[in-house]
């Protein structure tokens, strides 16, 4: 194997994004994925909603971070996203930690745009104080997979599981190793 500066283990979102980021910064990168394709586990099958922070009404810092991350993601990967006609958030009438008006007030104070569609739902639900529709997006996992496959094909080794001994050898050879696997 040729000497590389950075070894990244895991070909999901984190591994692929970090690989691209380090390459853009001029580093030499080797990406290893244990499966026969990148994006073949959670990064492909997750709901992949790109959210603005609507589901964090009790955490202002998290809403701010979500909005910042949303803008950053769209600046880098806008071609990998699609608009959603419906992106609904509902507040329960009973057993909720927050009432609808407080929720809407908090969301408005964070400058998040939404439409209250509580009275115009095309279906009936019980125990709802209200429903809002937002302008969030979804990440198209098929587009993302193809994008990263095309852009990382020259540095990606698929079908290769990296074990602890491999990591030790990479480090001994002077590589920086970043483990981007899930639940390891």
Describe the function of each predicted region.
Residues 4-30:
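N-terminal Rossmann-like FAD-binding beta1-loop-alpha1 element of flavoenzymes
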Residues 10, 33, 92:
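Short beta-strand/turn micro-motifs composed of small residues
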């Amino acid at each position: 194997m040729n000497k590389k500066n950075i070894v990244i283990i895991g070909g999901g979102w984190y591994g692929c994004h970090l690989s691209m980021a380090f390459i853009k910064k001029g580093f030499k990168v080797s990406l290893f994925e244990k499966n026969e394709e990148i994006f073949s586990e959670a990064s492909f099958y997750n709901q992949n909603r790109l959210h603005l922070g609507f589901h964090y009404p009790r955490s202002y810092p998290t809403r701010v971070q979500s909005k910042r991350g949303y803008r950053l993601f769209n600046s880098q990967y806008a071609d990998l996203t699609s608009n959603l006609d419906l992106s609904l958030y509902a507040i329960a009438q009973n057993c909720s930690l927050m009432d609808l008006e407080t929720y809407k007030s908090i969301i408005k104070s964070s400058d998040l745009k939404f439409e209250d569609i509580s009275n115009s739902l095309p279906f009936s639900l019980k125990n709802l104080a209200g429903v809002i529709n937002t302008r969030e997006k979804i990440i198209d996992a098929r587009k993302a997979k193809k994008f990263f496959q095309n852009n990382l094909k020259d540095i990606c080794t698929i079908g290769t599981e990296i074990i602890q001994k491999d990591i030790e050898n990479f480090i001994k050879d002077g590589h920086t190793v970043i483990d981007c696997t899930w639940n390891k």
